[in-house]
A protein has these predicted regions:
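Predominantly five- to eight-bladed beta-propeller fold
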Residues: 24-28, 77-78, 153-220, 248-251, ...
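A short helix->beta-strand "capping" segment at the edge of beta-propeller domains
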Residues: 28-48, 210-222
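Beta-strand-rich domains and repeat architectures in extracellular enzymes and scaffolds
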Residues: 42-78
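Conserved beta-propeller blade repeats
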Residues: 47-62, 97-114, 129, 136-151, ...
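Short glycine/acidic-enriched loop and turn motifs that connect beta-strands
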Residues: 68-72, 158-161, 252-255, 328-331, ...
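Short loop/turn segments that connect beta-strands within beta-propeller blades
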Residues: 84-88, 123-127, 202-204, 269-273, ...
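Cap/lid segment of the alpha/beta-hydrolase catalytic domain
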Residues: 441, 448-573, 580, 615
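Active-site-proximal cap/loop segments of hydrolase catalytic domains
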Residues: 514, 519, 527-723
Length: 723
């Protein structure tokens, strides 16, 4: 369930736009005037959300995408904005009520974008809008070749290999005949898959158009590219000479897809239409595997081949190398995300020697003597920026309490265009000049998307502590003070339980799990970086697999006990525990093991019954790796026994505290029967409980009115039991 920060941010913007694809009214930037200085759900949803960002070829301008939302209309609107590279002269280019997304520069004066499922262009001032593609509204992503003679177009095609097509004489039949696993993914049934298509840019009647003659790069192959559920155009790359395309693909279907994370990087030669796998030796055949047992100790992970996730390729500026993110082991989605560098001349590979996951990266200019690559990585609760030279030496460029969430060259060869957020600030755009010799890194904020709202708010202050753990180590714990904090007073306190289970408690800005919203409601937030989280070494992260109810639970209790015992502003008699996904699982488990510490629990989309979860979830590789075995295996491992024996549903007899269970019915990762089961069990035991269930939401809550209902229910419940 763990995903990188960049993918999560990009996918959320994409999914929200999909939910709100049809817009009747032009929804624009909010001029909300707040009645108090405390954050409200309405203020949160009034904020603009920055998405795609790109510098012009001459480095003089920046085009970017922003999402605005209307609570009344219950939908969003994606618009395109432009500004000078120093942040001046910001203006919105979108004037239509239709969303406009994925802006990119065709040349220094022309911007290409998607609207209505087609590729359009406009001048940098928003004029001369022209439609380039004619695909019946099917474009879902695109990328121009460096020579601007060709374009990759992402579009979906029908897929009936697993869910069979219903007979033509039964057009109103709603049943689905399923023949294998992966019949649904994340929040949808898999009845279509994305493929990349190649097209030429042609001049017709003195007008630039995209040829309707599309070449399917994966013609005849039943595989998706980009990869579901979060992959985008970043999973494909052009070579500098525009003759080759590198793409990401997991060439598996059905049960084999469901149990494996083995994706590869492929090279597609446009002239010959031949494809080469860069990650496997020629003739490689994957060993047979036991689909109901972890792949950790199976032959597939002893082959020496690249058998984990390999994705997001980028060619070096001179075309001599390709870099991509690479995981070593099949079946382990939270493996160390390494940066692999492939040499085109001889096929050799090397990996950047780094202690944590590479979240995203970009190549430095070809003539740069200080760096070869720039990348982002989480370390000690912050996602900062780093550079690497040809010697493999890594240098930290930023050292702020923030999460840098995206980076690319600013096209002047000297600066990096990046996005950044924190627990106290939503995403904005920055220009970063990397440190050179004695000159420190220079950081300049160039967008101020939500300044007019932030200036009206009072935020809680953040503190950092290193708390001893029961295994003799220390965990980093973020503590957020209430926005109305007064020295000498005590405040109700929330233990935040992170999901993943290998997602970082870093400086993320969330439009649901927003710490400043909790602070505005008068709560202290205690957020521990327990065992299992990245940014503290691979041993710390990997400890959690097979031990969901052991050390990480002790870490939660160590953090909240430290807060109650050592922080004078924490009211130990009014403690709550909240969390989503694995955090929701943690809440369900704590409900039976907290020894009267807590007065309220909230679990969002959490796993309650692990035996049910094993066969309910769609990405079986996750359950296999984390549990070791299917529950029916007679010779299952001791770790598997421990996992199933400690499933939260087996300790309901010890529940004694009010609980709110939240779930989305379109959540196919942790199916909604988990939340309903927990709620039903609590009520059958006579425990005060509430269930908030969304028929139209997935693992997240994406619609504005549902988001506000979520916030109101969350705080109504906490206020009832903790104040």
């Amino acid at each position: 369930m763990r995903r990188t920060l960049t993918l999560i941010v990009a996918s959320l913007l994409m999914l929200v736009d999909t939910v709100n694809a049809e817009n009747d009214v032009n929804i624009g930037k909010s001029n909300i005037k707040l009645e108090s200085r405390m954050m409200t759900p309405e203020a949160l949803w009034a904020m603009g959300r920055i998405g795609t960002v790109e510098a012009s070829p001459d480095g003089k301008q920046v085009v970017y995408q922003v999402g605005y939302y209307s609570v009344k209309q219950n939908k969003g609107h994606q618009v395109i904005c432009i500004m000078d590279a120093d942040g001046k002269n910001r203006r919105q280019l979108t004037t239509s009520s239709k969303s406009e997304t994925d802006p990119t520069w065709l040349d220094a004066q022309t911007i290409a974008f998607i609207t209505g499922g087609e590729i359009w262009t406009m001048k940098a001032d928003g004029s001369e809008r022209k439609q380039l593609s004619k695909t019946d509204g099917e474009v879902e992503g695109f990328k121009f070749s460096p020579d601007r003679q060709k374009v990759i177009i992402i579009k979906s095609m029908p897929f009936h290999e697993i869910i069979k097509k219903n007979p033509d004489d039964l057009p109103k039949a709603t049943g689905r005949r399923v023949t294998d696993l992966m019949y649904r993914h994340w929040d949808h049934y898999v009845e279509s898959i994305q493929h990349p298509f190649l097209a030429k840019l042609e001049m017709r009647n003195e007008k630039l158009e995209i040829s309707s003659n599309l070449i399917d790069i994966l013609e005849g192959e039943p595989y998706e590219c980009p990869m579901e559920p979060f992959g985008g155009i970043e999973q494909l790359a052009w070579s500098p000479d525009s003759k080759t395309i590198a793409y990401t693909c997991r060439k598996k279907t059905g049960a084999q897809y469901a149990i494996s994370t083995d994706s590869d990087i492929y090279l597609y030669n446009i002239g010959t239409r031949e494809t080469k796998n860069l990650c496997k030796p020629e003739g490689y055949q994957a060993p047979e595997v036991d689909a109901s047992h972890t792949l950790a100790d199976q032959k597939v992970n002893a082959t020496g081949a690249h058998v984990g996730y390999d994705q997001n390729p980028q060619f070096s500026p001179d075309g001599k190398y390709i870099a991509w993110q690479s995981m070593a082991r099949d079946g382990y989605e939270a493996d160390l995300n390494r940066l692999c560098i492939y040499t085109m001349a001889d096929g050799s590979m090397k990996f950047v020697d780094w202690k944590s996951d590479v979240e995203s990266f970009c190549w430095a200019p070809a003539k740069d003597k200080q760096a070869v690559l720039y990348f982002l990585s989480v370390w000690h609760g912050c996602c900062n920026m780093y550079s690497m030279n040809w010697k493999g030496e890594v240098k930290q460029l930023t050292e702020t309490w923030d999460d840098w969430t995206g980076l690319q060259l600013a096209n002047d060869g000297k600066r990096i265009l990046a996005t950044r957020q924190s627990l106290s600030t939503p995403t904005d755009i920055y220009m970063v000049t990397p440190a050179v010799k004695k000159q420190p890194t220079k950081i300049e904020q160039i967008s101020f998307e939500n300044k007019h709202i932030l200036d009206q708010l009072t935020f809680g202050k953040m503190q950092q502590y290193w708390v001893p753990t029961t295994d003799g180590k220390k965990e980093l714990v973020w503590v957020m003070l209430p926005a109305n904090y007064e020295e000498g007073k005590k405040y109700p306190t929330l233990l935040f339980c992170e999901g993943g289970p290998q997602s970082p408690v870093s400086q993320f800005w969330s439009y649901r799990w927003n710490f400043q919203m909790m602070a505005a409601n008068g709560y202290v937030v205690v957020a521990p970086n327990r065992h299992g989280l990245p940014g503290f070494g691979q041993e710390w992260k990997e400890q959690i697999s097979g031990d969901w109810t052991g050390q990480c639970i002790n870490d939660y209790l160590s953090a909240i006990d430290f807060a109650a015992d050592s922080l004078p502003f924490v009211d130990r008699n009014h403690l709550g525990a909240v969390g989503a996904s694995f955090g929701g699982f943690s809440v369900y488990f704590l409900a039976g093991h907290h020894n009267k510490r807590f007065k309220a629990f909230i679990a969002h989309d959490g796993a309650f019954n692990l035996e049910s979860m094993y066969t309910d979830t769609e990405e079986v590789f996750f359950s296999n790796w984390e549990y070791d075995d299917a529950y029916w295996n007679k010779n299952r491992t001791a770790r598997a026994d421990k996992t199933y024996e400690n499933s939260p549903h087996k300790f309901v007899d010890k529940w004694d505290t009010p609980i709110l269970c939240i779930h989305g019915e379109k959540d196919y990762r942790i199916v909604y029967n988990q939340g309903m089961g927990a709620f039903n069990a609590a009520r059958l035991r006579g425990i005060p409980a509430e269930l908030l269930i969304f028929p139209d939401e997935n693992h997240w809550v994406l619609k504005p009115q549902n988001g506000i209902l979520w916030q109101r229910t969350f705080f109504d419940f906490l206020n009832k039991w903790l104040k």
